[in-house]
Amino acid sequence: MPLDFLITKCGIGLHLLPILVCILSLVAVTTCYFLSLTQDHISPYFPYISDAGSKIPESCIFGQLLNIISVLAGLCFYSWHKHLLDPSHKFNQRCYRQIKLARIALCFGFICAFGMSVVANFQETAVWSMHLFGAGLLFGGGSIYALIVTYITYKYIVRSRIWIARLVLAFISLFSFILQPTTGLIARFMYDGDNIRKWKPTDKAGIIHEFTIIHRHANS
């Protein structure tokens, strides 16, 4: 009840939540990247985001910020859900299909937020399998959430062209999510260097590695 009241009645400033998520995400990535470089933990040549937050001390910052971001992201998903079901915004609550779609979208949004928390707390150097599991929840849940939200926007929110931008972003996210595991595994098995977190342009499968990272960043 207190959370519903906060979302539906005290909505001042809730529109800033997505902006705050983006700002904190940028801070987390850039801070960990430069800190990892100073500690000589990664290669400066376009590393994975997870590589930049896999060792102490940057892993502490990475984990803390991502945990905060995951909570804020969950609030974003929930606030959009409540906003959508508000009768004052012309959403037909008597239509079972719209309500069901909104709830399904919320579930995948929470899966995405939970996956981010798993990624934050299980670094790849600690428990690699759990880190991959969390990444799957994060990017997979986020991609499906984006597709459902795009459909809802197109089908039920009239006089809005924002669905076009959402459709483009949703397909970029889905396409990147599908390609990442394939190209990432190929690059990993073909790698012939000494430290997999310090890829160099001359390493074998370097182009595939960079291609994978581009899709990972696009998905993020």
Tell what function each PLM region has:
Residues 1-87, 101-115, 121-124, 137-154, ...:
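Early transmembrane alpha-helices of polytopic membrane proteins
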Residues 126-138, 161-163:
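Non-cytosolic membrane-interface motifs at loop->transmembrane helix junctions
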Residues 154-161:
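Alpha-helical transmembrane segments
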Residues 92-100:
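Short juxtamembrane and helix-loop transition motifs at transmembrane-helix boundaries
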